[in-house]
Amino acid sequence: MKILINIILVLIGNYAFASKLLIPMDQSQSNHLKAYGVAFWVLENDLEIKWLLNYRGGSFMLPNAKEIESECVIRGVSYEIIADAQAIAIESEILS
């Protein structure tokens, strides 16, 4: 029982500190064309977006906003919510 509670707390903790949304463009992406459409929608709405050319097929990193997450769900685009530490690690991996 304690193990289950610890797992739940870790998962909740990771979500609580999440500040970035990652749209992967590798084989895990369910719809590449619609993912580009989400990126274009984000740009049209004057929101920040980073194109990670050398990471997972040219993934996109965006701020974790409910509007963007909803747009991904509506369009059927795969996405991941990542924490600040993960975002920094990804950016440093690309730079090296």
Q: What is each stretch, according to the model?
A:
Residues I3-G13:
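Sec-dependent N-terminal signal peptides
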Residues S19-S96:
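Intrinsic-disorder/low-complexity accessory segments
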Residues A16:
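Non-catalytic, low-structured ubiquitin/UBL-interacting segments
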